[in-house]
């Protein structure tokens, strides 16, 4: 069975386009908020997962402080937790809501929040 001339022209074109790199527009996910943001994280992270606990209403700064660079902790050894301003350090970091809900983010930005 021979292919029609139309299919013979379309099949190579489809194969060529499927190998082309995505444009900047297709890599940008747009504004993702709430459930849309969580669903996008599930897709971006896959089996690696990401940190999300819908039962927590407030950010647990004690758990997040464990992820601060060791150098920061060593520089501030002599001070107690209240005076080193862990909350200020965390506020200065760009969060996923600011990055993907208030602004546009890409799939690569989402992958930064995977485990």
Swiss-Prot record:
Family of this protein: Belongs to the insulin family.
Disulphides: 33-101, 45-114, 100-105
Protein name (record): Insulin
InterPro entries: Insulin, Insulin-like, Insulin-like_sf, Insulin_CS, Insulin_family
Quaternary structure and partners: Heterodimer of a B chain and an A chain linked by two disulfide bonds.
Source organism of this protein record: Myxine glutinosa (Atlantic hagfish)
Any one GO biological process: glucose metabolic process
Gene, per the UniProt record: ins
Compartments, record wording: Secreted
Keywords: Carbohydrate metabolism, Cleavage on pair of basic residues, Disulfide bond, Glucose metabolism, Hormone, Secreted, Signal
Signal peptide region: 1-26
